Regions:
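C-terminal end segment of the histidine kinase catalytic
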Residues: 136-148
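Two-component histidine phosphotransfer core
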Residues: 1-131, 135
């Protein structure tokens, strides 16, 4: 799909999930999208790419805890597309294991099949804050796609 389509889907998916949350909950979405990027209208992104990140953030956050939060950042420039999702981990949850679940492995497999080495995916936990970061090097991927 195009990056524009993925961003539109992501924003709609976030709005649907926000209905489940108190208006006082610390929920932030930031976008830095360069709509003049040559990749903005290109069909270059896997469909539903952001869904795993957002679903996991909602699944593993304790909305009753005062200091809980979810932060989502989407960024597109002339070289890359990046999704970063941060959330305070629920103390009731057992997410602290370092390996991801089946959805996480499936996403990584899909990324590897399509983007080969033109992406980086990291997941870290520090001080009960889970950070998932995906960066796709669109320039490298697009160049390889059109030279092979």
């Amino acid at each position: 799909v195009t990056i524009k389509d993925e961003i539109d889907f992501t924003k709609n998916f976030i709005e649907i999930n926000k209905v489940k949350v108190s208006p006082l909950f610390d929920f932030q979405v930031k976008t830095k999208i360069d709509e003049t990027s040559p990749y903005y209208q290109e069909k270059i992104i896997l469909p539903l790419l952001s869904i795993d990140f957002i679903e996991n953030a909602f699944k593993h956050t304790d909305f009753q805890q005062a200091n809980s939060f979810i932060k989502i950042m989407l960024e597109l420039n002339n070289k890359s597309f990046q999704i970063q999702v941060m959330n305070k981990i629920s103390p009731k949850n057992s997410l602290k294991k370092e390996t991801g679940g089946h959805g996480s492995q499936s996403l990584e497999h899909r990324l590897k099949m399509v983007y080969d080495d033109d992406f980086s995916l990291s997941k870290t936990i520090e001080q009960d804050i889970f950070v998932a970061n995906l960066k796709i090097n669109l320039h490298e991927f697009y160049t390889k796609m059109h030279t092979n």
